[in-house]
Amino acid sequence: KKYPDFTVLSKKLSSLYGADLTSSLSKHGESQVIKISVSGLDDRYSLDDVSIAKELSELLCSVIFEPNVKDGAFIESELEQERRQLLDVIDSEFNEKRIYAMGQLIKHMCKDEVFGIKRYGTAEKIKAATAESLCKAWQNLLKTAKFEILYIGDSPADKAKEVFAKAFANIERNVVTSSTDVVKNVSKEKHITEEMELSQSKLVMGFRT
């Protein structure tokens, strides 16, 4: 809410001596990992004894805990922009047949397992998502997800700790622990063939041990 568009956010980052804000999404086993990080100047180099660590922590908490939400929903125009970008990523993976073949292997081999779900989900799920449903998912994530906070730098982490402690104090947490279901045996082998016009075929094999 404090930084409703990229222009305002860029100005804030520039005011913090060119700080950098990044995010990424990945899968580690059966867990989906969302990483949001901010990096900037060490406190000892700032002017007027301003705590850059505190400012960066407040910025990060603002992004995580106070996104652009209105009437219980994300901003529709921003949602559509992100939806298009995500669908483009999925399309690009289809065009890269090596990545696509590996994805299809995991999809069919782990059909009824959490591990079989792609990190971005499916195009159908992305198209069906609404501003309201995503807002509810974000609220649920804040309550149930496991958070790991890493602070790296020469300056003391005290001020950063205070910022995050204050942010989490307003949330009723009920962390859900994930478990791994290992399926070692299968009753029958699967053979999946997809026919396409390609100059080079892709063969992928999966084994359980």
List the model feature ranges, each with a label.
Residues 1, 146, 173-209:
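His/Glu-based metal-binding/catalytic segments typifying zinc-dependent metallopeptidases
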Residues 1-7:
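Short intrinsically disordered, low-complexity coil segments enriched in acidic
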Residues 3, 120-123, 192:
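A generic, residue-level signal for flexible/boundary positions that often mark functional hotspots
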Residues 8-176:
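Charge-rich, well-structured scaffold segments of protease-associated domains
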